[in-house]
Amino acid sequence: MPESKYRQQTIRAPRGTVLTAKSWLTEAPLRMLMNNLDPDVAENPHELVVYGGIGRAARNWECYDAIVDALTRLEADETLLIQSGKPVGVFKTHDNAPRVLIANSNLVPHWATWEHFNELDAKGLAMYGQMTAGSWIYIGSQGIVQGTYETFVEAGCQHYNGTLAGRWVLTAGLGGMGGAQPLAATLAGACSLTIECQQSRIDFRLRTRYVDEQAATLDDALARITRYTREGKAVSVALCANAADILPELVNRGVRPDLVTDQTSAHDPLHGYLPSGWRWEEYQKNAQSDPHGTMQAAKRSMAAHVRAMLAFSKMGVPTFDYGNNIRQMAKEMGVENAFDFPGFVPAYIRPLFCRGIGPFRWVALSGDPQDIYKTDAKVKEIVAEDKHLHHWLDMARERIHFQGLPARICWVGLEWRQKLGLAFNEMVRCGEVSAPIVIGRDHLDSGSVASPNRETEAMRDGSDAVSDWPLLNALLNTASGATWVSLHHGGGVGMGFSQHAGMVIVCDGTDEAAARIRRVLHNDPATGVMRHADAGYDLAVECAVEQGLNLPMVAATQGKG
């Protein structure tokens, strides 16, 4: 690893109302970049790694310093361009243009492989941005908690008469994304057993209350799960072991969980999945000395992992891929039926996407948790009839530990995002909150991603791999005036398997911000409704009609004026 990717430095975003940059529109991306590297947020901040294997916030430390310098000097009518974590230009635009435009890890399709990307990365020519790492809107594990919670709740509705009480979830991975699983299961009323091969990750999740207990052995873990499910308690248990060993052992013992999934970093076999029988230090060393052999060893272990998941599915246990591309990796190693169990989006989430419902998130730039609690109350006031959402907000306040700048996520759709954004902007204007708020989302949203093994798996019209949609989403958010816009490749599922876009907008209390919010927070989720209506989903067409969208090739939306 080049020396410039390592620095023993602790970074935390500024708090309060004193600006380092020239305006809140440039202070916001500066603080969010720094927040991504806060040691309470990032998995490996000294190497600029935020989450998801090698998902970085900047290409190297020289690039980080240059980005910070550029943002502090950026004028109100200038736009900073970021190419794979490197600041490459500042251009005159206008005051309603994005202040930052980001493109991360995009490769011409024929060369969009981990092997080619790793060559570029080693030469200092590329950076893996994951989804929200390189787009500076990661908020820690909370960012995926509600999506995982909604998935588990829907699984309970489909398979267990609406409740997961007395049930248990078997999964693996306690990294930046997977770390949400045990808390999400608990909030959904289920016990969980999560396998994680790094003790440091278990320690972090115990400290932040995302996991309740650690078992010493597999027998100990199963005894705890048996006791808690019998008592009807929702308790999360972690076990330090390798999932490629534990899941086959559970199959051999005839153990029957109630749900099975996985959120290891299987998308990145070189950095994210420990081969069976290896120590983590050995894995890291071999990744440098023998990358091909290391990737093959990891994929062989993934194949064993997926065979066990297939065995659970054959037992009748609801089993699903949670978007890390482990099925694809197993298929490449000869597991021809790896896709016999579904991904979580077609199984549980797509009806939400049809209505533009997805991971709406916001961050208090003040650093004051009270600002988030006040916005929680505002959400309840505006979305007054959604008791399920109110329940989520109550649980989040009680159980979710803020990482870095205080933040909140809640899944809302096209009908509500603009209204909430305008309300937050008004709260800033009249001083109800102490500093501006940024609103963003995961790239995992209804109109912002093409990922045939995850978000766009099994589309009704067969358009799973069509990536025009995230490109259009990024272009429209740029035209609408988002504060920063990002376009990435490979997030979630790895090189060659996804393209996706993100946006962030600042609520600074001004009339100009309100105008931008009206455009961005309507148009962004509307692209998701558009994408699903175009694919033939009746629920999306109904939403398009209700919300007055003009979709020229969708007849139901025409002739209204």
Swiss-Prot record:
It is found in: Cytoplasm. Binds 1 NAD(+) per subunit. The active site is at 410. Its main location: cytoplasm. Keywords: Cytoplasm, Histidine metabolism, Lyase, NAD. Its cofactor is NAD(+). One of its GO terms (biological process) is L-histidine catabolic process to glutamate and formamide. GO terms for molecular function: urocanate hydratase activity. Pfam families: Urocanase (PF01175), Urocanase_C (PF17392), Urocanase_N (PF17391). Disulfide bonds: none annotated. GO terms for cellular component: cytoplasm. NAD(+) binds at residues 52-53, 130, 176-178, 196, 201, 242-243, 263-267, 273-274, 322, 492. Its EC number is 4.2.1.49. It catalyses: 4-imidazolone-5-propanoate = trans-urocanate + H2O. SUPFAM superfamilies: Urocanase. Transmembrane segments: none annotated. Pathway: Amino-acid degradation; L-histidine degradation into L-glutamate; N-formimidoyl-L-glutamate from L-histidine: step 2/3. Belongs to the urocanase family. Catalyzes the conversion of urocanate to 4-imidazolone-5-propionate. This is Urocanate hydratase. The lineage of its organism: Bacteria, Pseudomonadati, Pseudomonadota, Gammaproteobacteria, Enterobacterales.
